[in-house]
Amino acid sequence: MGEKHERETIINKYKHKKAGSRNIDSISTNKLMEEFELIAKTFMGLEQVLAQELTQLGANNVQIGRRMVSFTGNKEMMYRANFQLHTAIRVLKPIAHFKANSAEDMYDEVRKIDWSKYILKGKTFSVDSVVYSEEFKNSRFVTYKVKDAIVDQFRENTGTRPNISVSNPDIRLNIHIAEDKATLSLDSSGESLHRRGYRQESVEAPLNEVLAAGMILMTGWKGETDFIDPMCGSGTLPIEAALIARNISPGVFRKEFAFEKWADFDQDLFDSIYNDESEEREFTHHIYGYDTDMKAVNTAKLNVAAAGFSKNITIEHKDFKNFTQPKDKSIIVMNPPYGERISTPNLLGTYKMIGERLKHQFMGNEAWILSYREECFREIGLKPSIKIPVYNGSLECEFRKYQMFDGKLNEFRAEGGIVKTEDEKKEMAQKHRFKKNREFKKRLDDTESNEEGDIRSFTFHSFEHERPDFGKKFNEKRKPRRNFGDDDRFGDDYKSFKGKKNFGGKKFDKGGKGGKNRYKNFDTNED
């Protein structure tokens, strides 16, 4: 009872209700229940996973597209989609669909929209363009044309024009053109949702957080066993696994979302979503991350502590070639080097070693491996039970499952063993869809500048070494929801990473100006 009581005390102590705030019950029911079209973007190969997340969240009219899932929902659903989805890159709210066969057509259609409803006086805006069209070959040209139409409307109606802000706009717009079909949307997310907010430092070619979460969700693991990443790098897979195991919303670390700057932003509604911990659950197993690079190990420990999962995750300096059979039921999910961006002296030998360790030291468990080189997979020397195609940036990879059992396959099945579930068979079927869309890969380089934060954002900067003034600017703009240094909940092991600095659980400041602090702590003794 002591540990449970302690956790409840911490949660209750740091939950605040702003004085004088409106009761959600008093808000117009019609406004809250009004549904509209929404689009969640993701990586190629994760659409099915994202659709399942949206369905579980309660979204309506869920339909899968290429690198996106469309759905309908009200304002609460839009807030929840940003805050709770693990596999969404951003959430868009379409405000206009139209056909444009020329630049003049597009300009005229954009001017038809009443922009005074979306961009208030004194507010700034930006436009991102994604273009797949023979007519509109230059995305920057599309961006400028949309911007001109908006600015000209304001100048004609008011005599003044809104300013453009690329780095920190009040309103973010997104236009998507496929041949002559255009969709103009409000970007409700802002910075790409893969930027969770817990990453303090990184290593070369870190795994994108959205892709990591998608990989874990594709395995079906939700915390029922121990989780092992034997080549953990900066710790992305272990941290995303902890979020999934404890059912914690990945948006909890975010400083802000774009919708918080909208004219119709409902602070009370978002506070109720943020403070709702009813779906969080206990995690009775453990997560392990190993790496041979000591710098990666220290970086992973730093990121794990920043996320508040030191009780759930153990990071150690270990070589997988010395891996031995775990005592408890476990799953391995790993992202070994491919040789594309990271130079590995004996790449094929590494994969051969992986297969040998799995075959002799992982009986009775399952392992999932992401790679894109067929010759690497061949060196593993094991037959995968499932192959799921997925893109890692511009690399067309495969995520393969290896069911490790002792003896013959027929004997394993006779004893009730399952090599491939029905859901996994459906995922496998997606491979044929990929083969029909090979041309998409050729377009990725063309769209890199359009969606740098979505598709190719694998470079993260050290806050300490490369941006010494980051902390000052960060706090001047808006206090983060998690603020290191509040207490000693992370323990002495974390202090050693930062010398005299004490990085406790981050303190959350919601509500913009005058907002009271909220705190969330995931590192309690109960875990």
Task: Report each predicted region and the residues it spans.
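Conserved S-adenosyl-L-methionine
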Residues: 207-325, 340, 348
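Basic Arg/Gly/Lys-rich low-complexity intrinsically disordered segments
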Residues: 1-33, 401-527
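Class I S-adenosyl-L-methionine
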Residues: 130, 155, 176-218
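Short SAM/SAH-binding signature in class I
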Residues: 329-335
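Conserved hydrophobic/aromatic beta-strand scaffold that supports enzyme active sites
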Residues: 174, 397-401
